[in-house]
Amino acid sequence: VKMAELSIERIDVFQVDLPYSGGVYKLSGGREYRSFDATIVRMTTQKGIEGWGESTPFGATYIAAHALGVRSGIAEIAPKLIGLDPRRVDRINDAMDAALIGHEHAKTALDVACWDIFGKSVGLPVCELLGGRTDVNMPVISSIYMGEPEDMRKRVAEHRAQGYIGHSVKIGGEPATDAARIAAALADKKPGEFFIVDANGGLTVETALRMLRLLPHGLDFVLEAPCATWRECVSLRRRTDVPIIFDELALSDASIIQLVADDAAEGIGLKISKNGGLTRGRRHRDIALAAGYTVSVQETAGSDIAFAAIVHLGQTVPEKNLRCVLESRDIVALKTADGPFDVKEGRVMAPTLPGLGITPRLDVLGEPVASYF
């Protein structure tokens, strides 16, 4: 039986500003963010099936990605995808790589839109196509920006009151202040809660070691992205028994394989826009599972469309390996799509609707800023 034909006929690109819901978001190194520039893609097949995807970098100073680069990258890639079958996701990624080396953040929205079409074309949710859903009610994690210790403690408490059981606490300054931030954020820790302490590459080995020595004994947390370079992170790892996970340095097949080879961490923060979408995200999930790692399925930033994609990927990770899914919608003050992605008591499950299960708000998206056909 011949497979029914399906081909990409048109790609429309939308731009939306997503204001940060808490005013100013602060990361190590004096980085501040007030809003995030989202690129949203609508891919249409010759049969009228629409697929949606989003790529929203965390500003221009988090990793080597920026919003203008997403749209200029799509301009390079999109014309080469017209006429291809969106269900052949690996072949789509081959075509994207042939059109543009790297620039994974530009490929993400296109890749996710293909998966949305694939799901709709066969009447299945994306998580079933990615390997099949678990029955795990997945914990979402908060994002607590770097600030005064007691203020961070207060913001953890506010998220706890909303039902969150996981918290990502940002650090990356002077050792004594960072130690105080961690101690304050964990001061009211409840049974079953977990904490990721994320320096976003902001520590040197020296400041990390000093900070760890200043901490009260027995605090239970995982240290994420302590240092900016691979060598520094491995050096720190050799001298501490604190569990470490990589994020900014876990970007590609090669880097995650090297992570395993070097025994450099216990897990990864898997952000699909950083890694290139769900096709590559699926592969990175599998490498991590083969290594026995824990996986935090996340996004750099993003609205409802980005959140839907990571919920579907997270839903395929076995419970013992799934650390959390990042509630990316929590940090933006604009809703771009509707769908059954309600967080209840700090947990979420992927819907059973075909594709991603979202309906974009076209009035919010406005008119396309570019179209390819």
Q: What is the predicted role of each segment?
A:
Residues 219, 228-243, 250-347, 351:
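Shared catalytic-loop signature of beta/alpha-barrel
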Residues 356-373:
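Extended hydrophobic packing segments that form well-structured cores
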Residues 53, 138-144, 167-169, 195-199, ...:
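Hydrophobic faces of well-ordered beta-strands that scaffold small-molecule active sites
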